[in-house]
């Protein structure tokens, strides 16, 4: 291993190593021999772009981490990736590339067959690019065999769900009010209506004249004037109070609680409430439509214009308490209208234009016609007030066109009938985290029937044929079934337009049945992935592999893919197809905003990789709590790169010294070295096996962030920052020293085990280290197995002692900083005063560790009472607390504290309270009544920690100062060795020119300097060498020369 951490170089080498040696293929062959099965289904990304979003990279990295882990645990893992290739996004992009803007142009100008071919080409090219990006990031999946939702086998398999729904009586054709995109000319399901924009629309109050009462009007409010030509009735709430309000010569009917607000908005100052009455009185009241003379459809429904009870659908939060109702353009209106047998008037075509029955508005785009409608209302004195409103309005998730609601005939699956079954399956599944269950459960409670039909081209054709003679419906469950009943040949490509030519013989009348022109909802495609991706023999494969062990995606997929899988699973198999669901967060920018190119805050993964390398990105992603949103941060990536460098250096240290001493791990057993273990070795083994146990437990819940954080923390905090600082000098012992062998054995053991775990997170770095460091290795670290937990090595008592030691060290470093004494400068002694006798007994066993890390020749451990010899704690009154507690006695209490400061302080520190008497009253002080001020004996510095106090002398002896200077010089020499790229086993020739008054000091410590720097000789005075540098040490200049010697340690 090289000492330089250079991921940009070695990651490319590792990638080439994997490819040249077919590592994934070999791993798969090994993996398939395992008896334990792990079925994973990839939530297929949509290939609308050739470059993955960094959020998608996070998603794939989590998946890769889990799949790598399950392989290491001995599972045969199904890791087929997939791509969700159908649907509007690709159609819209293809339209742009072809320079067209409508469905008509697809049919008339391009041709459906050519359009489908172009869509497929787009999906394939982008999928290839995405695959290359994922492979480049070390995602080990079966990239040679991905599933595509456009594949014939996949489409054929998916038809089984439609067939099953038909057989269960769940498939039907019906009219519902649905969102419609006028540009794409297709319907959208409720869950597809997820994008909103702030749009400015009219906000108008309209008067409907009451029949038989020339001056009385029902007042309604609407922000969609274009729906008024389709008005059928007015809804009220029969339990609300309504008012007749005189305005000029007219009487306006308005909900009583909305009168004041409406008059203010309409700027009507002169009005009078004539009477107030229950809404029930208005029921059945008939009215005249103000546009009846110019909208021909209105003449056909004149006798239906009346007031109906809408119940809770009518509120008093806005409007007038009277609701304009058009069953052809509102889902609530539709349901209420159906209850009262009202007609459905829908005057809008697929393009969003008014039909001929709209009279003067025919042929006009509905939203554009609103101003004309308002003008016509005004001309007919039916407009009470008009203004503008900015509100959040749904738009098409792909083309961003404002959606409209239309009552249209579509194909549905009656999912609402399965609600209880769906809820039962949600309870059975394991949701990580728990709130995922709540969110999807709330959605299912409100589930509506699934509109599965779409009026587009690039999608899975619905396998529904209708007989032209008797209207018999034939639903096909797969291409084999279709081949048996078709009159003509089934095409090789099951897409439109080819599938549209297939004619089926009607089994009822012998007539010819033709396929409906619709394609499936794109969510249908990904929702069948759990079985449709398994190939032609999916039933057999599912019986062997199912159910799916895990699915994981972003939290938006609770209402998307997770629900879609659940729905199709229950329709087809009566159960959820998955056992566990893991939810991850969104990738946001540093301000917490979603990252988009259009927002200017988007960072491509390649930008991160080119700067830091792949594993820095992977580690940073995986250390974020999986189900929480992550904020992208260059600073965090810098820190992650630093942590990787520390991990690298730990392995470099181990590799360097073990190679130097030709240490072979396999030569020794635990029994060989156990008698030579020191407490720090026992502690490290305990920490390692505890970490291993915690990681394995966390991964039962797929908590990859805990895996990433626990393993890296173990190497950085426990090994690098603690263990190696304690044991580093043991590596300088003789090669066959049993103390050294014990240290090597323990270090190698925990480093190899940790590396195997790390390979799931940072596979490039782990593979590089594995190939260079691990002895008697396999061809790849991915072929290893997770080590077994050995409970007998977990020692809580020792771990607790070392945790206290860590606190002592931190406090000691704090005390050094207060005293201005650098860590390299040795101390004669450090006092540690501990509150607990148990802690004192534990720490007395590891004073060598403290001595090494605090750089002190002696560590003196005492109980907390010993600290009193060096310090005094005084109490001063806390007047803010004394006044409210002691009231009239507060002045005397404060005086008492001042006069008895030491005693009060001692009692409160030792007992938590101090009792005393003032004016014959027994009183008690506690910590809230005083401020404690600590005074340490002159010449000493202390630092408190949770278990006690560390104390050291502020002034150093001459001997200590001398040793400090020598250690500073040694550090400079070691740095120069590094600049010369010398190995630790190579000797140097050393020369030093020191200030005149320090020459004797150098001579005194000559042998120590030579030993510490591996100097074959040391000359004092004239300086020469391959590298010569001036150094400032304690404000004096030393010139040092270093050359490589001709001999090295054997």
From Swiss-Prot:
Keyword annotations from UniProtKB, A to Z: Aminoacyl-tRNA synthetase, ATP-binding, Cytoplasm, Ligase, Metal-binding, Nucleotide-binding, Protein biosynthesis, Zinc
Cofactor: Zn(2+)
Alphabetical list of Gene3D superfamilies matching this protein: HUPs, Isoleucyl-tRNA Synthetase, Domain 1
Record keyword Cell inner membrane present: no
Enzyme type, top EC level: ligase
GO cellular component: cytoplasm
Enzyme Commission designation: 6.1.1.5
Family (UniProt): Belongs to the class-I aminoacyl-tRNA synthetase family. IleS type 2 subfamily.
HAMAP family hit by this protein: Ile_tRNA_synth_type2
PANTHER family: ISOLEUCINE--TRNA LIGASE, CYTOPLASMIC, SOLEUCYL-TRNA SYNTHETASE
Protein name as annotated: Isoleucine--tRNA ligase
């Amino acid at each position: 291993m090289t000492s330089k951490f250079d991921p940009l170089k070695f990651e490319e080498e590792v990638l080439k190593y994997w490819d040249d040696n077919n590592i994934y293929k070999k791993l798969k062959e090994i993996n398939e021999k395992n008896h334990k099965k792990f079925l994973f289904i990839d939530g297929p990304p949509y290939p609308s772009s050739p470059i993955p979003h960094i959020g998608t990279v996070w998603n794939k990295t989590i998946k890769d981490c889990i799949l790598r882990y399950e392989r290491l645990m001995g599972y045969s893992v199904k890791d087929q990736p997939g791509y969700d290739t159908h649907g509007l996004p690709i159609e819209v992009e293809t339209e742009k590339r072809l320079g067209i803007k409508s469905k008509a142009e697809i049919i008339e100008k391009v041709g459906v067959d050519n359009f489908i071919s172009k869509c497929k080409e787009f999906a394939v090219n982008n999928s290839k690019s995405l695959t290359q990006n994922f492979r480049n990031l070390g995602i080990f999946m079966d990239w040679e065999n991905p599933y595509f939702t456009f594949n014939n086998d996949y489409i054929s398999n998916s038809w089984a769900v439609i067939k099953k729904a038909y057989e269960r009586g769940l498939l039907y054709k019906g009219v519902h009010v649905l969102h419609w995109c006028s540009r794409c000319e297709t319907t959208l399901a409720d869950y597809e209506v997820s994008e909103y924009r702030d749009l400015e629309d009219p906000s108008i109050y309209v008067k409907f004249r009451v029949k038989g009462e020339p001056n009385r009007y029902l007042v309604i409010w609407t922000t969609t004037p274009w729906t008024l030509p389709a008005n059928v009735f007015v809804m009220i709430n029969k339990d609300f109070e309504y008012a007749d309000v005189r305005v000029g010569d007219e009487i306006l009917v308005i909900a009583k609680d909305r009168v004041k607000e409406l008059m203010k908005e309409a700027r009507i100052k002169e009005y009078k409430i004539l009477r107030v009455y229950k809404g029930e009185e208005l029921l059945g009241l008939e009215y005249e439509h103000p546009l009846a003379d110019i909208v021909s459809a209105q003449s056909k429904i004149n006798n239906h214009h009346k007031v109906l009870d809408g119940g809770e659908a009518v509120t008093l939060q806005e409007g007038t308490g009277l609701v304009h109702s058009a069953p052809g353009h509102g889902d609530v209106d539709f349901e209420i209208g159906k209850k009262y047998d009202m007609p459905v008037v829908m005057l809008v075509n697929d393009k969003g234009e008014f039909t001929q029955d709209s009279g003067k508005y025919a042929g006009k785009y509905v939203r554009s016609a609103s101003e004309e409608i308002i003008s016509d209302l005004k001309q007919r004195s039916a407009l009470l007030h008009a203004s503008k409103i900015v509100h959040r309005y749904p738009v098409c998730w792909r083309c961003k066109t404002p959606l409209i609601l239309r009552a249209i005939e579509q194909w549905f699956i009656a999912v609402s009938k399965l609600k209880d079954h769906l809820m039962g399956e949600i309870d059975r599944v394991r949701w990580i985290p728990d709130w995922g269950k709540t969110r999807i459960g709330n959605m299912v409670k409100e589930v509506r029937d699934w509109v599965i039909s779409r009026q587009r081209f690039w999608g899975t054709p619905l396998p529904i044929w209708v007989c032209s003679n008797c209207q018999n419906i034939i639903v096909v469950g797969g291409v084999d079934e279709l081949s048996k009943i078709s009159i003509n040949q089934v095409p090789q490509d099951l897409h439109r337009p080819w599938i549209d030519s297939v004619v089926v013989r009607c089994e009822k009348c012998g007539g010819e049945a033709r396929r409906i022109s619709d394609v499936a909802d794109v969510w249908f495609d990904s929702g069948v992935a759990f079985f449709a991706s398994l190939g032609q023999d999916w039933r057999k494969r599912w019986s062997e592999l199912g159910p799916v062990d895990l699915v994981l995606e972003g939290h938006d997929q609770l209402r998307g893919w997770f629900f879609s899988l659940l729905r199709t699973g229950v329709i087809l198999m009566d159960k959820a197809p998955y056992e566990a669901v893991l939810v991850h967060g969104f990738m946001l920018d540093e301000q917490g905003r979603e990252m988009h190119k259009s927002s200017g805050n988007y960072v491509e993964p390649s930008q991160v990789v080119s700067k830091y390398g792949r594993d820095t990105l992977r580690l940073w992603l995986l250390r974020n709590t999986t189900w929480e949103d992550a904020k992208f941060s260059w600073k965090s990536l810098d820190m992650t790169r630093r942590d990787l460098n520390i991990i690298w250096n730990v392995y470099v240290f181990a590799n360097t010294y073990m190679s130097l001493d030709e240490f072979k791990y396999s030569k020794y057993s635990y029994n060989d070295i156990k008698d030579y273990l020191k407490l720090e070795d026992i502690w490290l083994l305990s920490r390692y096996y505890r970490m291993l146990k915690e990681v394995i437990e966390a991964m039962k819940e797929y908590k990859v962030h805990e895996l990433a954080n626990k393993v890296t923390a173990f190497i950085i905090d426990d090994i690098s920052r603690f263990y190696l600082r304690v044991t580093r000098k043991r590596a300088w012992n003789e090669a066959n020293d049993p103390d050294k062998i014990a240290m090597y054995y323990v270090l190698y053991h925990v480093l190899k085990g940790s590396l195997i775990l790390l390979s799931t997170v940072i596979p490039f770095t782990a593979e590089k280290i594995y190939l260079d460091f691990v002895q008697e290795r396999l061809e790849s670290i991915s072929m290893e197995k997770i080590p077994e937990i050995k409970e007998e090595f977990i020692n809580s008592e020792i771990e607790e002692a070392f945790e206290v030691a860590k606190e002592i060290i931190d406090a000691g470093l704090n005390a050094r900083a207060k005293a201005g004494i650098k860590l390299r400068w040795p101390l004669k002694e450090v006092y540690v005063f501990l509150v607990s006798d148990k802690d004192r007994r534990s720490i007395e066993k590891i004073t060598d560790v403290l001595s090494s890390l605090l750089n002190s020749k002696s560590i003196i451990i005492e109980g907390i009472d010993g600290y009193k010899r060096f310090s005094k704690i005084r109490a001063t009154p806390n007047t803010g607390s004394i006044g409210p507690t002691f009231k009239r006695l507060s002045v005397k209490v404060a005086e008492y504290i001042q006069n008895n400061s030491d005693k009060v302080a001692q009692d409160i520190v030792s007992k938590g309270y101090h009792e005393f008497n003032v004016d014959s009253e027994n009183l008690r002080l506690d910590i809230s009544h005083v401020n404690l001020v600590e005074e340490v004996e002159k010449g000493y510095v202390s630092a408190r920690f949770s278990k006690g106090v560390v104390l050291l002398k502020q002034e150093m002896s001459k001997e200590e100062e001398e040793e400090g200077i020598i250690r500073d010089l040694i550090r400079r020499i070691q740095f120069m060795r590094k600049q010369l790229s010398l190995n630790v086993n190579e000797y140097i020739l050393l020369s030093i020119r020191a200030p005149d008054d320090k020459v004797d000091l150098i001579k005194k410590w000559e042998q120590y300097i030579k030993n510490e720097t591996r100097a074959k000789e040391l000359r004092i005075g004239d300086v020469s060498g391959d590298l010569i540098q001036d150094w400032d040490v304690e404000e004096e200049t030393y010139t040092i020369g270093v050359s490589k010697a001709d001999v090295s340690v054997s």
